């Protein structure tokens, strides 16, 4: 219920009131029975048009323009064509299609195990890497000019036909050997 209310732009105050069963109406955050002065400011919860990267809706894309076809090239050189949606990130897309792209930090920008090489024709279509991504790429083995982290590449219509090649090796710095399950 809260999610559907949030999509409609329900104020935070109303959601808190519903959850607590009281109306917050007095300065200082004390509750009352509906008497007193209501808070003068409200904040609205609103859903954006995008969805979290990597999530897949059961209904599939709504418009043909939402589909982005890309190719993964695995460590053995096998080409794996997949279809994603605008807003997906490359790490989650690869995992969803069984491509062996690790993502040890679960897309939190704390490792370089989702390191990929981006096809030269599409590299300039990506925004430049932020400093945190560059820091993680510095730890990636076999770094090249077209290296990026898959968790930081978000599919756009311009990436139609892009190729993401997995390097021959990756380095997982997790001490305890934890390997997360793909989302």
UniProtKB/Swiss-Prot annotation:
CDD domains: fer2
Organ and tissue specificity: Widely expressed, with highest levels in testis, kidney and brain (at protein level). Expressed in muscle (at protein level). Expressed in fibroblasts (at protein level).
Record: transit peptide: 1-52
GO MF entries: 2 iron, 2 sulfur cluster binding; electron transfer activity; metal ion binding
Region (Disordered), start-end ranges: 45-65
Keywords carried by this UniProt record: 2Fe-2S, Disease variant, Electron transport, Iron, Iron-sulfur, Metal-binding, Mitochondrion, Primary mitochondrial disease, Transit peptide, Transport
Cellular location(s): Mitochondrion; Mitochondrion matrix
Superkingdom of this protein's organism: Eukaryota
Domain 2Fe-2S ferredoxin-type: 68-170
Residues annotated for [2Fe-2S] cluster binding in this entry: 105, 111, 114, 151
Gene Ontology CC, one term: mitochondrial matrix
Cofactor: [2Fe-2S] cluster
Binding note for cofactor: Binds 1 [2Fe-2S] cluster.
Protein's UniProt keywords contain Lipid metabolism: no
A biological-process GO annotation: ubiquinone biosynthetic process
Function of the protein: Electron donor, of the core iron-sulfur cluster (ISC) assembly complex, that acts to reduce the persulfide into sulfide during [2Fe-2S] clusters assembly on the scaffolding protein ISCU. The core iron-sulfur cluster (ISC) assembly complex is involved in the de novo synthesis of a [2Fe-2S] cluster, the first step of the mitochondrial iron-sulfur protein biogenesis. This process is initiated by the cysteine desulfurase complex (NFS1:LYRM4:NDUFAB1) that produces persulfide which is delivered on the scaffold protein ISCU in a FXN-dependent manner.
Family designation: Belongs to the adrenodoxin/putidaredoxin family.
Disease cited in the entry: Mitochondrial myopathy, episodic, with optic atrophy and reversible leukoencephalopathy: An autosomal recessive neuromuscular disorder characterized by childhood onset of recurrent episodes of proximal weakness and myalgia often precipitated by exercise, infections or low temperature. Additional features are optic atrophy, axonal polyneuropathy, and reversible or partially reversible leukoencephalopathy.
Subunit structure: Component of the mitochondrial core iron-sulfur cluster (ISC) complex composed of NFS1, LYRM4, NDUFAB1, ISCU, FXN, and FDX2; this complex is a heterohexamer containing two copies of each monomer. Form a heterodimer complex with NFS1. Interacts (in both their reduced and oxidized states) with the cysteine desulfurase complex; this interaction stimulates cysteine desulfurase activity, and serves as a reductant for Fe-S cluster assembly.
Protein name from the UniProt record: Ferredoxin-2, mitochondrial
